[in-house]
């Protein structure tokens, strides 16, 4: 079980959660994801790792409330626990040796753009970001 340490409503349909997951945070890299289950009977939900903090041992996820499982996840508050939180999964995005990059994201897909842009910047790469949303109410 993993504790929710921060919850922020980014807009009426998108939520950010920071979750205690030290083993996941220790190994997380940009471009990877986690799979969670809200409770023992819940379905498995794959979500992008939007950020990670190795020192605090936390993983940040951003999700759009679109169906039963994300509605159930959104009911949880700071201090509540997520039943299963597995990761990091997937192949990290290649970031080594690049000099100038445009990182593009749209809507909730901007969640994956941030850790990639952050890592590239840390490596000394010139990073330009292009983000888009359907309308001003959906900006995260």
Whereabouts are the PLM-identified features?
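FNR/FR-type flavoprotein reductase catalytic core
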Residues: 68-140
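Ferredoxin-reductase
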Residues: 1-78
